[in-house]
Amino acid sequence: EEELAPATEAFLSSFKGFRILSEQPLVIEWYTDAYELDAENNVYTMWPAYAGGEAPWHSLAVANLGVLNGELAYTYSKADADGVEWADFISGPSLDILSNSLDKALRTDEIPYLPTLYQYISEEEAAERYANLRNFYANYGHFWVGTGPYYLAGAYKAESVAVLTNYPAYPDEASRWDWLVER
């Protein structure tokens, strides 16, 4: 998507590669020519995220199927240029497209980037994740699956209201970040 090209080109101009050194524990070497004067800004995350935040791989895989089918685009400009829906995970016509893409993923146990990820994602795990995503969509009416202490229980765009609900099984205690609070 052309809108993403400048940021991608800037990234690729300094990115040299990465290497997985171990999986248990996960240790990854990252090679780049870019650096910051403040050392803490030189640490990169390998967590999959996009402009709207973190996302589980199975949500992105479903959206990618919609993009590959020529029904969705990740940016407004690409959606307008191609006459397709913007990939809105919360509301609108894209939900039907995402739902259809999810059905395809469920039928095929789709594993994205198969040559690499088959080592880490089994067909059984893929099937389980897609089934969980189907249940999430049935319960909440959207595909915005979070990874934090809250989940989007409802979204009402006309009213500009989002309802967030505590996710009690979130593994981090609320006190984990207390050390960041100035006293």
Features from the language model and the residues they span:
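Polar/charged alpha-helical tracts
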Residues: 119, 124-132, 178
